[in-house]
A protein has these predicted regions:
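Short, Lys/Arg-enriched N-terminal segment that forms or immediately precedes the first helix
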Residues: 1-6
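N-terminal helix-turn-helix DNA-binding core of bacterial DNA-binding proteins
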Residues: 7-49, 55
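Non-catalytic, surface-exposed connector residues within folded enzymatic/regulatory domains
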Residues: 11, 44, 75-76, 93
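Basic/aromatic recognition patch in beta-strand/loop cores that engages polyanionic ligands
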Residues: 48, 55-59, 76-78
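Beta-hairpin "wing" of winged helix-turn-helix
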Residues: 60-76
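Basic, amphipathic "hinge/linker" alpha-helix immediately C-terminal to the N-terminal HTH DNA-binding motif
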Residues: 76-93
Length: 110
């Protein structure tokens, strides 16, 4: 089976993460699982790639992080969750428009 090159998809990691965060706030492991599931296991994002994207997007104002305490029963651990901002929604829309154009151009060559 052919794997997707990380170089090819690198510019769209943010788009995939923002897509997931539009539905609801989430944390790293859950986002990673969602990307794997939605891509039908054709793309598995590396942990370092994921957390680098979180850092970059938070710095750019596309997402916000917050810590969620474990439930009232005390089970589990604190997790850092991420949520999309209005600026992140705008960025997502721009990246989707960019993808349509990119796909149109590349399809002329394959």
């Amino acid at each position: 089976m052919i794997e997707i090159s990380s170089d090819v998809i690198r510019g769209y990691n943010d788009t995939m993460i923002l897509y997931i965060l539009q539905k609801a706030p989430s944390y790293g492991y859950e986002i990673s699982k969602s990307i794997k599931q939605i891509s039908e296991e054709k793309y598995i994002i590396k942990e370092t790639t994921l957390y680098s994207a979180f850092t970059r997007m938070e710095k750019n104002g596309y997402i916000e992080s917050f810590v969620q305490d474990p439930g009232p029963d005390g089970n589990g651990k604190k997790r850092t969750y991420y949520r999309i901002t209005d600026l992140g929604r705008e960025y997502y829309k721009t990246k989707c428009e960019e993808w349509v154009l990119t796909k149109e151009v590349i399809e002329r060559f394959v």
